[in-house]
Amino acid sequence: MASSVPAPSGSVITVASSSSSAAAAAVCGTGSPCAACKFLRRKCQPDCVFAPYFPPDNPQKFVHVHRVFGASNVTKLLNELHPFQREDAVNSLAYEADMRLRDPVYGCVGVISILQHNLRQLQQDLARAKYELSKYQAAAAASASTAPTGPQAMAEFIGNAMPNGAHNFINIGHSAALGSLGGSASVFGQEQFGNAQMLSRSYDGGEPIARLGINGGGYEFGYSTAMGGSGAVSGLGTLGISPFLKSGTAGGDEKPNGGQ
């Protein structure tokens, strides 16, 4: 039930009984009136609507609210709200009153404008960062789409890079040139060269291994045991300095003479 209480300043304050009366009674029971009643110089009743929200230890809060909005308007607003909404309403009024006293022209609008400007700036920065990131992602996706993937694609890539499927790996120990090989009686140069190894191209039946050695070696050609052979290297044998061919373990016993 609401009742009107005249204030010393001539304004009328409406006091409504609500569930917050217990909190107001606890404040008033200590003998110290709430900040609103103390400022208005009146006795704080147990059902005072201001007591739960304007404690006596923070009088400046009610002073600012009363100066900007007026005590009667605040009382009317609190009476129209539910008890669980009053605390948020009082805090909003106190903040807005404080900002209005700091900036009489703009008040809270000035702070809101600054925050909105900062928000727009951050949104623009975020959009630019997303645009730059999308460019890098598009470039990475294009590179991944053009790169060969899988064993078959890798084989095609190697086949295109090396026509006719030839895979030659030559390691030369010393910087020198090999003499030309001509016919069945090819003659190497007399100078001492380093060891040279050449891996010929792969055949369907296995992986042939060819070695070319100059320093007291010769020429050997055969198949490794990985191809399912007998284990011993078979082939044409060794080609020394003289132009003779000697059969290997798997070859025949024929020897071409020097006149061939």
Curated annotation (Swiss-Prot):
InterPro entries in alphabetical order: LOB (IPR004883)
Residue span, LOB domain: 32-133
Compartments where found: Nucleus
Major subcellular site: nucleus
PROSITE patterns: LOB (PS50891)
Tissues expressing the protein: Expressed in leaves, leaf primordia, immature ears, immature tassels, whole ovules, silk and husk leaves. Found on the adaxial side of organs.
UniProt keyword annotations, A-Z: Developmental protein, Nucleus
Superkingdom, taxonomy of origin: Eukaryota
Pfam family, one: LOB
GO CC, any one term: nucleus
UniProt keyword Ligase present: no
Job of this protein: Promotes the switch from proliferation to differentiation in the embryo sac. Negative regulator of cell proliferation in the adaxial side of leaves. Regulates the formation of a symmetric lamina and the establishment of venation. Interacts directly with RS2 (rough sheath 2) to repress some knox homeobox genes.
More about this protein: Might be partially redundant with the IAL genes.
Family affiliation: Belongs to the LOB domain-containing protein family.
UniProt subunit comment: Interacts with RS2.
Protein name: LOB domain-containing protein 6
